[in-house]
Amino acid sequence: MRVDSSADPTMSQEQGPGSSTPPSSPTLLDALLQNLYDFGGTEGETEQKKIIKKRENKKRDVMASAALAAEPSPLPGSLIRGQRKSASSFFKELREERHCAPSGTPTGPEILAAAVPPSSLKNNREQVEVVEFHSNKKRKLTPDHNKNTKQANPSVLERDVDTQEFNLEKARLEVHRFGITGYGKGKERILEQERAIMLGAKPPKKSYVNYKVLQEQIKEKKAAKEEEKRLAQETDIFKKKKRKGQEDRKSKKKSAPSILSNGRIGQVGKFKNGTLILSPVDIKKINSSRVAK
């Protein structure tokens, strides 16, 4: 695409050597915008080319802003000349890039990687957290003072328990000894013997008896038990007979109804108009009381 020098006032001003009055800045900006519209208004462009152009324009804007920020502020007299040179160089770059198309557009991550300075990466590396792992084996190698104290404490506790048990045993034996004194002399000796065996003394040997003598002793014991049972039965029979006689007498007394069953003292039946009226129940009571006497 060709750019007319007549349409661009900046180009005409640069070509004309005898131009005495430089144009104002608003007219220069208007001319730049017209050239941009003419340059980007070609027909038959595909959507892909439009996207590529947009990306290129964005990159150029970013680069231009960065260059302007980096450059020192120029003097007020040299502003117009700098604007003219930047406009002419801008159009030249556009033409060159138009003729030789770019091989590939850089992607987003590449642009970000280029924009990020290396100092920030170093800071990120320094901010990485460091985690230390301590194994349990190393801890076991170091002597534990707490364990030694724990091992010493159980021995003290065992001693305390032993003393407590000893005191309880002693108290139990004292109570047992005091209880033995309450019995007679004959039984007291037997209980003392049992107490000595309980404390650890050897029991006395059993007396050996002949087999025939032992059988006779067993028979005598059986006979004594049978006699006791027979006497107990006889006494029970005698007591039962007495109880039966007493119960019979009580039952007879209960069966004989009393004349004073109505609760009135010396009165039988009911008085009505000066006459005593006896019911058949009252007559039966009177007859039964006479028979009982």
Swiss-Prot record:
Molecular function as annotated in GO: RNA binding
Biased composition (Low complexity): 64-79
Compartments, record wording: Chromosome; Nucleus, Nucleolus
Biased composition (Basic and acidic residues): 134-147, 222-238
Presence of the UniProt keyword Chaperone in the record: no
Residues where N6-acetyllysine is found: K185
Location of the region described as Disordered in the Swiss-Prot/TrEMBL record: 1-28, 40-82, 94-119, 134-160, 222-266
Annotated GO CC locations: chromosome; nucleolus; small-subunit processome
Annotated GO biological process: ribosomal small subunit biogenesis
Residue numbers bearing the Phosphothreonine modification: T163
Residue positions where Phosphoserine is found in the record: S73, S78, S86, S279
Pfam family for this entry, one: FSAF1
Keyword annotations from UniProtKB, A to Z: Acetylation, Chromosome, Nucleus, Phosphoprotein
Function noted in UniProt: Part of the small subunit (SSU) processome, first precursor of the small eukaryotic ribosomal subunit. During the assembly of the SSU processome in the nucleolus, many ribosome biogenesis factors, an RNA chaperone and ribosomal proteins associate with the nascent pre-rRNA and work in concert to generate RNA folding, modifications, rearrangements and cleavage as well as targeted degradation of pre-ribosomal RNA by the RNA exosome. Prevents helicase DHX37 to be recruited before post-A1 state.
Subunit field text: Part of the small subunit (SSU) processome, composed of more than 70 proteins and the RNA chaperone small nucleolar RNA (snoRNA) U3.
Name listed for the protein in its UniProt record: 40S small subunit processome assembly factor 1
Organism field: Homo sapiens (Human)
Upper taxonomic lineage: Eukaryota, Metazoa, Chordata, Craniata, Vertebrata
